[in-house]
Amino acid sequence: QRVAIARSLITQPQIVLADEPTAALDYRNSEDLLNLFEDINLDGQTILMVTHSANAASHAKRVLFIKDGRIFHQLYKAGKSNQDFAKEISLNMSALLGGE
């Protein structure tokens, strides 16, 4: 999976579609990949990441919650730490799934 990711990024596409990119990676490699995504996003590359992981989503600038094929809610990181943003994402995920 790491090789496939590297091959997709080498051409510096305008947009990267990452569907559950950390699903088959261990924690260290997941964090390395997510940090890489943050870095290349700061360089102007757009990344559209599909994930069910609050931790993975916490590396994004903006998170969209999709329900029944429509945008249900969105959050902006706006200077929050990854840890604080992950907590906010988790709370919103719980609400979306009918929790609290």
What are these regions (language model features)?
Residues 59-65:
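Conserved catalytic segment of ABC-fold P-loop ATPases
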Residues 33-34:
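Conserved hydrophobic alpha-helix in the ABC-type ATPase nucleotide-binding domain
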Residues 45-50:
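Conserved H-loop
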Residues 27-29:
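Helix N-cap at the start of a conserved alpha-helix in ABC-type nucleotide-binding domains
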Residues 11, 43:
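Conserved signature/switch motifs of ABC ATPase nucleotide-binding domains
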Residues 16-19:
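Catalytic Walker B motif of ABC-type/P-loop ATPase nucleotide-binding domains
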